[in-house]
Amino acid sequence: MQLSEIEREQLYAIVEKYDHHPDVQRMREYIQHGSVTTYQHCKNAALVSFWLNRRLHLHADETSLAVGALLHDFYLYDWHTTGTFHGLRRLFEMHGFSHPGYACVNAKRVFSITRKEQSIIASHMWPLTFRHVPTCREAVIVCLADKYCAVVESMFQRSHAGAVVDGSVDIDGEEW
């Protein structure tokens, strides 16, 4: 799944103002899957979403798609150290269920994102978050891209020495 150099430039032109923000850069501090940081995971999801839209001719709004993908896990905490399962009541407070809400609140607060971008972020964990169903093509694309990236990162991008994979190389082996 590789974007052309021109497509990468187009994608980066959309997300550049978000990418340089200090709070987005904070996502580099947190591990997402295996040894991949949350920042790298979100970048991977943006690249895969853009690729799916272009290659499958899905005609999605590329700005909303790219912004929603980049910010879909903008929750800004280490989910590995928060909470444990203590029965059914606490189930919906666990990270998998709750982080889309935190990410959406943070994105609205920091960037004043659109309703469509909010929908993308809020529904990206469907079907786990069964009440937040993707309602636009951009949300479906990001939801699928997120699942794909999570599998690739968890199975194939694990560090054997505990090093963190981040920043310079994405899921297809190239920079932005």
What do these predicted ranges mean?
Residues 1-176:
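Metal-dependent phosphohydrolase cores
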